[in-house]
């Protein structure tokens, strides 16, 4: 207490400021090891649909967009299957016949859209010629659309990156410096309120780096940011690899690679098929690609973070890492990360340890397992 401060000479330093917390607790700032800051800011600009059923979702979207212009995109986030188990485009068609609607599922790896959106994407919602292979309220692995028993699109798209309207929205936000800065400041404010003083950010887009630089220049960057590059798109990441960083507030983080999808979208890569989706093992990346990613990291001398949710995705990553490390043991010193790792085979736990790999799991996956369907 006071004796320790006195011995250290702190109490005699005129620059020291004393604050009486009146018995409250002080803890070090938290580090969040996996965020999407700009997208979080975007979430807060539109309705949250978390925990809402279909009727309440329609009400929330209508309230936020009371008089939309014809053709204006209606966007919202975080609906989930426990509260809304049977989403369908017709529900949105009835409520919003003149506007494309994009509702992002809580995992971020799936979207619920209406017919206007499908039309804007150039997708025919009727049954394709080979609909038999993708019917039954499920989808063939190569088809991002979930279809009903007749093969018609239900309005669920399994991979959000397959939604061109959503991707165009993100590009619009990134291209507008003021809008991007506002989204980042919203996220930073939320981090401050929760005691987060540093975070690992899936930055991905070059303009977001410029947004952070502006905030830093004006003294408004209130947390240390590690900016992750998007390894699946080398051209995009080449820009982010420029010397844009510096100091301890804004640093260049690992390269991020995506190896599968999510359980709730039935795109997480599994060793066995989904219990209620026969024949669907999810989606993954060829082993040769994973090995190429690892060789690339060795060449760049950079850490890598690999999105792998399903047990097959984790297994394939470990297979590739063992193969590459066998040729170049230096790979074990890179502290490679497996992001999420929601399902791991028991025999792979030792392999993770032997390869000196970090598992970056998120508590939310444990706290809300009911949101990840069978």
Locate the predicted segments by residue.
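Divalent metal-binding segments
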Residues: 2-238, 257, 262-313, 326, ...
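Non-cysteine beta-strand/loop elements that form the S-adenosyl-L-methionine
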Residues: 36, 249-267, 356-366
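Histidine/acidic-residue-rich catalytic or RNA/ligand-binding cores of hydrolases
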Residues: 115, 209-213, 314-323, 350, ...
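Phosphate/diphosphate-binding loops
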Residues: 220-255, 335-342, 346, 372-374
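Feature representing long, continuous alpha-helical segments
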Residues: 288-292, 315, 319, 336, ...
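N-terminal active-site wall of soluble small-molecule enzyme domains
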Residues: 322, 326, 345
């Amino acid at each position: 207490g006071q004796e320790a401060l006195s011995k250290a000479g702190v109490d005699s330093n005129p620059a020291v400021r004393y604050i009486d917390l009146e018995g409250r607790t002080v803890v070090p700032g938290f580090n969040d090891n996996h965020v999407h800051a700009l997208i979080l800011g975007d979430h807060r600009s539109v309705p949250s649909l978390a925990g809402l059923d279909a009727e309440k979702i329609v009400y929330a979207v209508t309230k936020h967009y009371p008089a939309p212009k014809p053709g204006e995109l209606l966007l919202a986030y975080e609906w989930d299957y426990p509260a809304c188990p049977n989403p369908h485009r017709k529900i949105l068609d009835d409520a919003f016949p003149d506007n494309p609607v994009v509702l992002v599922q809580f995992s971020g790896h799936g979207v619920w859209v209406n017919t206007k959106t499908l039309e804007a994407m150039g997708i025919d919602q009727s049954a394709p010629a080979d609909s038999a292979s993708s019917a039954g309220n499920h989808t063939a692995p190569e088809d991002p659309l979930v279809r009903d028993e007749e093969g018609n699109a239900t309005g669920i798209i399994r991979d959000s990156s397959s939604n061109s309207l959503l991707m165009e929205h993100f590009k619009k936000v990134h291209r507008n410096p003021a809008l991007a800065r506002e989204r980042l400041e919203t996220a930073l404010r939320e981090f401050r309120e929760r005691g987060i003083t540093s975070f690992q950010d899936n930055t991905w887009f070059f303009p977001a780096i410029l947004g952070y630089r502006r905030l830093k220049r004006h003294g408004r960057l209130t947390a240390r940011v590690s900016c992750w590059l998007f390894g699946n798109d080398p051209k995009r990441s080449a820009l982010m690899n420029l010397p844009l960083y510096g100091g301890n507030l804004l640093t260049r983080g690992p390269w991020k690679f995506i190896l599968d999808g999510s359980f709730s979208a039935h795109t997480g890569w599994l060793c066995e098929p989904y219990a209620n989706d026969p024949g669907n093992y999810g989606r993954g990346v060829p082993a040769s690609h994973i090995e190429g990613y690892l060789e690339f990291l060795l060449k760049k001398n950079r850490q890598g973070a690999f999105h792998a949710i399903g047990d097959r995705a984790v297994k394939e990553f470990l297979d590739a890492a063992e193969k590459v490390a066998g040729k170049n043991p230096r790979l074990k010193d890179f502290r490679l990360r497996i992001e999420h790792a929601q399902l791991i085979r028991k025999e792979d736990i030792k392999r993770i340890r032997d390869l000196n790999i970090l598992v970056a799991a998120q508590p939310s996956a444990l706290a809300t397992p009911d949101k990840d369907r069978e």
